[in-house]
Each structure stands twice: as C-alpha cells, then as structure tokens.
Regions:
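Gly/Ser/Thr-enriched, mixed-charge loops and adjacent short helices
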Residues: 18-167
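Phosphate-binding and adjacent anionic-ligand microenvironments
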Residues: 167-171, 184-187, 207-298
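Short glycine/serine/threonine-rich phosphate/pyrophosphate-binding segments
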Residues: 14-17, 103-107, 179-182, 267-270
Length: 298
C-alpha cells in the first residue's frame, strides 16, 4: 500500500536549517493546506515545551506494529534501468564522478556502480557532521547546493583538464543533501541548471519512443524561455505551472507530462515505458541522464 513520507533534511540549505519535509501518499510535495497545518501544530508543540509529546525508546520502535524496516536503496537501485539507459552508459565506458556532498545519496551511488558495472567513482564518500569537506558558498556559509559554483568548487577543480587536456572523469555530478537536486560538471565547468534542463528535455523526447505521443513538457513560470523554444522545436505542448514541483504531480501520474522541471535544478521524468517514475524531484536520475546523453550522442 501507499504511505505518507517524512524526511528531515536541510536540503540545499545550511545544515543548521534542517527542516521537516512531508510527502502525502501520491509521493509528491504536499500542498499548502497540509504544510500550514503541520507548521501550526509544530509551533503549538514547541510553545508547550514538548510536554504533550509521547516519548518512545528507540530500541522499542521496531516492536510497534506500524513500524518496520524497508530497503529503499535496493528497491530504488534495482529499478533504475527502467528510467535510464544504463546499458548505453556501461557500453560506452563513460567515466562518472558522483559527489553526494555528504548527503543521502552517498550509499546509493556506490550501489549503482556495483549493481550495473559502471565506471563510477563516489568522489567524496565521507559523511562528516561538521561538513569539513565542503567549500563555502558565496556568503561564507556551508550550503550543499549542487547548483552553486562555490559549493561545487572541489568538483569543478577536479574536472579542470590537465596540461594534456585529460580529466579523471568524462562527466561529474553532484546532489544536495536529500538528493532531489542535481548539478552537472563538464570540463568546461558547472552547467547552468536551465541550460541542462533544455538539453535533457530535447534528448528525452527524441529518445523515448514508448512515451505517449501527447506527453507535454512541464516547466515553472520562472524557468528559462530556452525550454519554450525546445518544446516548440520538438513539437510538444508546453505546460507552465506556478513555482513549486507539486503542480507537476497530476501530470506525471497520468503521463500527460513526460517531464517536469524547475529552474532550481530539480526535475523528474517518466520511465522508459511511459509510466510514472517519481512524483517528486529526483536528482540521481537527472545526474545519470547526463551520462546517458554523453554515451548516446557523444
């Protein structure tokens, strides 16, 4: 069955700004009615000094009939080839450097490399509560923002060609703490998120023959007009929504949208067979898609 989802994460913000992220059973972001209720209830609890909160020992949690372990990692990794042409990546021998920026994808990238036999290196597998491995963002704060050239400085430096024009990876990628955002680094530097979304859209809609013929391109109102021109060039309807990935959820579920993306380096798209993959942003598939594009188009 379906369940609600809760993630405690700072996302791409400073670690001290850890937040409570709620996803209803459809998997996408919650609407404002739900988030407003959660915020109101949380503030009520805080005002009372936690006295109304029941406490349970961690050792007793798994004894509760409503709590059990689930192997999200294996479940996710085993299905990746349904949304990404991983065979093409492996056969082309694309060398990938994946930096989880100390976030939730750290174990996923290693499992992906092993499961599919990819030339993939987890650039920084370190998990450090002090975030000592992070370069500071533009304002001097630690921020796991994979779309920031400051936060991605280490990966950008690693991809700088040597005197012979060589780099350790053909493509490098980063994810934020909860891995719903992506950053793509080539020897030329960190790609502009809007530019990569435009490339991804053009590629997907011309290399997914089993997608519905009427599936549209989804973008937020503040995303680049480049996407409008790409949608027009490939003969696909463009659907503009207000800022917020939650507005893409119905279209992704029904496959009326083949792709939904927002300017802040977050997107998702359909499986290869044209059915829904994720109703929230998935930074891992967007990162792997860059390697697929390189493998297929050179």
């Amino acid at each position: 069955g379906l369940a609600d989802g809760i993630v405690v994460t700072p996302s791409h913000n400073p670690p001290r700004d850890g937040g409570f992220k709620y996803n209803p059973p459809h998997g996408g972001p919650a609407d404002s009615d739900a988030t407003s209720w959660i915020a109101k209830r949380a503030n009520e609890i805080l005002e009372k000094g936690w006295r109304s909160v029941d406490r349970v020992l961690g050792s007793d949690l798994l004894e509760h009939p409503c709590i059990h372990r689930f192997d999200y990692l294996a479940y996710y990794v085993d299905q990746l080839d349904q949304v990404i042409d991983i065979d093409a990546i492996r056969e082309a021998g694309v060398r990938i450097g994946a930096d989880p920026l100390g976030g939730a994808s750290v174990d996923y990238w290693g499992a992906i490399a092993e499961r599919y036999g990819l030339e993939l290196t987890v650039v920084n597998p370190k998990v450090d509560p002090a975030w000592s491995f992070m370069t500071l963002d533009w304002d001097g704060k630690i921020r796991m923002d994979c779309s920031s050239p400051y936060a991605m400085a280490s990966l950008r430096d690693a991809m700088t060609p040597d005197e012979n024009g060589n780099t350790p990876y053909d493509i490098a990628t980063g994810n934020d703490a909860d891995s719903d955002r992506h950053g793509i680094v080539t020897p030329d530097g960190l790609m502009n998120p809007n530019h990569y979304l435009a490339v991804a859209i053009e590629y997907l809609f011309t290399h997914r023959p089993n997608w519905p013929a009427e599936a549209a391109v989804g973008k937020t109102l503040v995303s680049s007009a480049l996407i409008d021109r790409v949608a027009d060039s490939i003969g696909r309807k463009l659907v503009e929504v207000p800022v917020g990935f939650k507005y893409f959820v119905p279209g992704l579920v029904s496959a009326e949208l083949g792709f939904g993306g927002e300017e802040s380096a977050g997107a998702s798209f359909l499986r290869k067979d044209g059915t829904v993959w994720s109703t929230d942003k998935d930074g891992i598939i967007l990162a792997l898609l860059a390697s697929e594009i390189l493998a297929v188009t050179g």
